[in-house]
Amino acid sequence: MITLRIKDLREDNDLTQAQVAKKLMCDQSLYSKYERGEREIPLRLLIILAEYYNVSLDYLVGRTNKKEFNI
């Protein structure tokens, strides 16, 4: 579920893997492995992505389908 969500969010925001990888301070090849599910994405990077896309961690991990981030 995480892999689909991070890829969909990236594409919905018209971003390349390289752009997101730069935000996460990792190589594009590593980020690509996260999207394909070949590597498990660390929690600290999920937190950065949730803040970047303004979605909840629950959305990223598939616990909810509600994208909105509630403060």
Where are these regions (language model features)?
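A short, Lys/Arg-rich alpha-helix, primarily the initiator
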Residues: 1-12
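DNA major-groove recognition helix of helix-turn-helix/homeodomain DNA-binding modules
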Residues: 25, 44-59
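Alpha-helical residues within the helix-turn-helix
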Residues: 11, 22, 51
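Short, charged recognition helix plus adjacent turn
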Residues: 12, 61-71
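DNA major-groove recognition helix of helix-turn-helix
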Residues: 35, 53, 64
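Short, basic-rich loop-to-helix N-cap that marks the start of a DNA-contacting helix
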Residues: 38-48, 67-69
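Short alpha-helical DNA-recognition segment
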Residues: 15-33
